[in-house]
Swiss-Prot record:
Domain of life: Bacteria
Pfam annotation, one family: CsbD
The protein, known as: UPF0337 protein RB10934
Family: Belongs to the UPF0337 (CsbD) family.
């Protein structure tokens, strides 16, 4: 979670990476997220019909892999 401040600050650049990881997310979804971690978890959960803990896990993996 320490990286999240950096992710939030670079969200415009990282939206593409997020879209690669979650291809079902729309540009509107990603704009709505606007770098907010909880919002991303919610959108991933909603789009993919996941349990909150699974969505959290995926966002954590994204956080680890984004090289921020």
């Amino acid at each position: 979670m320490m990286n999240w401040d950096r992710i939030e600050g670079k969200w415009k650049q990282l939206k593409g990476q997020a879209q690669q990881q979650w291809g079902d997310l729309t540009d509107d979804d990603l704009d709505r997220v606007d770098g907010k971690r909880e919002e991303l978890v919610g959108v991933v959960q909603e789009r993919y019909g996941l349990a909150k803990d699974e969505a959290e896990k995926q966002v954590q993996q994204f956080e680890s892999s984004c090289n921020c």
